[in-house]
Amino acid sequence: MSEGVDLIDIYADEEFNQDPEFNNTDQIDLYDDVLTATSQPSDDRSSSTEPPPPVRQEPSPKPNNKTPAILYTYSGLRNRRAAVYVGSFSWWTTDQQLIQVIRSIGVYDVVELKFAENRANGQSKGYAEVVVASENSVHKLLELLPGKVLNGEKVDVRPATRQNLSQFEAQARKRECVRVPRGGIPPRAHSRDSSDSADGRATPSENLVPSSARVDKPPSVLPYFNRPPSALPLMGLPPPPIPPPPPLSSSFGVPPPPPGIHYQHLMPPPPRLPPHLAVPPPGAIPPALHLNPAFFPPPNATVGPPPDTYMKASAPYNHHGSRDSGPPPSTVSEAEFEDIMKRNRAISSSAISKAVSGASAGDYSDAIETLLTAIAVIKQSRVANDERCRVLISSLKDCLHGIEAKSYSVGASGSSSRKRHRSRERSPSRSRESSRRHRDLLHNEDRHDDYFQERNREHERHRDRERDRHH
């Protein structure tokens, strides 16, 4: 029978009599030596020369007694993994580099390698969990790996406990706060604050990602949302040359943007146009024209309080006392602005195409008149002071200068030698006079209407002279 409630006698409910000749009272249970001596493990196995201890008569346990407990014993590594935390390395350290350092101390049984990563951007936090196959490897890692240099920094090794995990997490937060960009490329952790979870501390199941999911690639620069404008120099770019733009006026129907958002993709242009925008090719629209002009004032305009209308802040010629050649100030909605700009682009493209075609056919007068008409129409539009309109006008003027130079170089040459002779006599003086007039009038935008009328009279006189010459 069994002793106490800690063990189970598997033969308590049935008799172990295999031969009916033996009497139950005379039977010696071979299992009594084991079951009755559990309190003294050293007496489990008795010598064959010693007589068996007498069978103690004890009452059998009641049927409704307490359920006996089953005991289990385990070895040291059967219930937990052999793992350590390795940290204090740089965020761009790869799993292959870490494994090479581990193998350099004689540990080759690495089972798993998990990097702690930011959930926001997938960047390493600078520590990892290393799982090995034996306790001996754990001792080697704890004794030999600390102090090893990995990417210029000495690694730190600690047992894989919750307390050490919290310490490595705190170190990772401090490193993110004081990290300096290397080579002008800021780490991705600077794209947002170093708070990865609701309670401020990341859990191992959330931040320890298997090494197979890590992709070693150069860091990318993300927009600096939720960061103050002072974080802009971290990008390796010079500070903006002009102050931040004023908020949008109420005439646009759009509320001003929140002050905490920094529009990196809408960086303001430099105060003066670069060389490739000074003389663009005919019909080409220079880059960076997709920016909304409402966010950035023109380069030659003084940044002040929000203007009441769209046009008042961009009138650079009124302080000279001359009349305003632009359209009267008026409010322009965003949809109307885009519609006018689309129409101006179509006018500019059509005029340049027609002028180039006419100049190729030798009809320089019509080509020049077409370009002058397009310039006048765009200047009279309600968004003429916008930077994009000025670029369109500049393209038209460049095309006009090219056609005029070609027309005066050709002159009034015809098929007969007499016409060529008379052209040589008259062309130099007329060419110099007309070129000087064109330069003076084109650079003075306030006299554009007078210039247009003067050009018409000049063309009429030229046609009269040609008609008289033929007659």
UniProtKB/Swiss-Prot annotation:
Covalent cross-link Glycyl lysine isopeptide (Lys-Gly) (interchain with G-Cter in SUMO2) as placed by the record, residue numbers: K354
Location of region: Arg/Ser-rich domain: 418-469
Cellular component GO terms, alphabetical: cytoplasm; membrane; mRNA cleavage and polyadenylation specificity factor complex; mRNA cleavage factor complex; nucleoplasm; nucleus
Residue positions where Phosphothreonine is found in the record: T203
Keyword Nucleus among record annotations: yes
Residue positions, PTM Phosphoserine: S205, S413, S423
Annotated region (Disordered), positions in chain: 33-69, 176-220, 409-471
Domain RRM: 82-162
Location within or outside the cell: Nucleus; Cytoplasm
CDD domains cross-referenced by the UniProt entry: RRM_CFIm59
Gene3D superfamilies: 3.30.70.330
UniProt biased composition (Pro residues): 50-62
GO molecular function, one term: RNA binding
Annotated family: Belongs to the RRM CPSF6/7 family.
Comment text on domains: Contains an Arg/Ser-rich domain composed of arginine-serine dipeptide repeats within the C-terminal region that is necessary and sufficient for activating mRNA 3'-processing.
Name assigned to this protein: Cleavage and polyadenylation specificity factor subunit 7
